[in-house]
Amino acid sequence: MLMPKRVKYRREHRGRMKGRAKGGTEVHFGEYGLQALESAWITNRQIEAARRAMTRYMKRGGKVWIKIFPSKPYTAKPLEVRMGSGKGAPEGWVAVVKPGKVMFEVGGVSEEVAREALRLASHKLPIKCKFVKREEIGGEANES
């Protein structure tokens, strides 16, 4: 499971997810990618489930790059506890994903295999996603 080795503070404010992703909006490592169309918190368990779905479908061929990392802790108070008396204990880790962010990349496989692998991965995530191709230098953006 993905999580930071150490953090400066155990608890964080929730924050707001405004606007589009600033960086990581293009396919850099592989030939194909899975791009977010909505903003959400993606947990480390969801990232791992998506990774397993992709690698299981691709078998031994190809390579997968995970371009998001769950660096934000989220907290929860136990059930049936009254309001107040401090913030809850850290429950897990999430990655903040905004629209336009390429979350996963795949390389070394055909387009059909990559499209199906990324489709299976998208079913494990709580947001709408789209399949994107790497932009060739000097060419137009190839998105489908």
Curated annotation (Swiss-Prot):
This is Large ribosomal subunit protein uL16. One of its GO terms (cellular component) is cytosolic large ribosomal subunit. Belongs to the universal ribosomal protein uL16 family. Binds 23S rRNA and is also seen to make contacts with the A and possibly P site tRNAs. Keywords: Ribonucleoprotein, Ribosomal protein, RNA-binding, rRNA-binding, tRNA-binding. It comes from the Bacteria. Part of the 50S ribosomal subunit. InterPro entries: Ribosomal_uL16 (IPR047873), Ribosomal_uL16_bact-type (IPR000114), Ribosomal_uL16_CS (IPR020798), Ribosomal_uL16_dom (IPR016180), Ribosomal_uL16_sf (IPR036920). One of its GO terms (molecular function) is rRNA binding. The keyword Transmembrane helix does not apply. One of its GO terms (biological process) is translation. HAMAP family: Ribosomal_uL16. The keyword Ribosomal protein applies. Coiled coil: none annotated. The gene is rplP.
